[in-house]
């Protein structure tokens, strides 16, 4: 799946939440979290363009969610991918433990890292270094 994603062969329908998580897990293998974040940021925006999903302030790439999942998965990336996918930090709803939906789905959080407004993350977020 990672190769299909990186090489532009993953369809829009195949780009599910689980596909995002697996891609993130693979990106973290042999890379620092900051390197994985950079790779994923570029690859997701490119993928979105390739499948007709515009990267705007209301759709496409979401920086705060990407930072959240790279950070969460980097804490457990030494585990097999199936265990990572089963982590409570990797569910679709997990970020809502830390952000209100309005803040997380708002334009500022989509375009740049926005710190949580409900509770602090249990780990320091992976940001560009």
Which residues make up each language-model segment?
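Conserved, aromatic- and glycine-enriched, well-ordered alpha/beta core segments
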Residues: 7-82
């Amino acid at each position: 799946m990672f190769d299909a994603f990186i090489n532009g062969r993953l369809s829009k329908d195949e780009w599910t939440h689980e596909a995002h998580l697996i891609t993130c897990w693979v990106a973290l293998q042999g890379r620092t979290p900051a390197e994985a974040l950079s790779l994923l940021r570029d690859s997701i925006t490119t993928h979105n363009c390739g499948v007709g999903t515009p990267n705007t302030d209301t759709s496409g790439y979401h920086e705060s969610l990407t930072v959240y999942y790279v950070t969460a998965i980097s804490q457990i990336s030494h585990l097999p991918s199936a265990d990572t996918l089963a982590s409570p930090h990797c569910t679709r709803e997990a970020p809502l433990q830390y952000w209100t939906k309005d803040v997380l789905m708002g334009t500022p959080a989509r375009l740049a890292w926005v710190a949580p407004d409900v509770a602090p993350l249990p780990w320091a977020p992976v940001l560009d270094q």
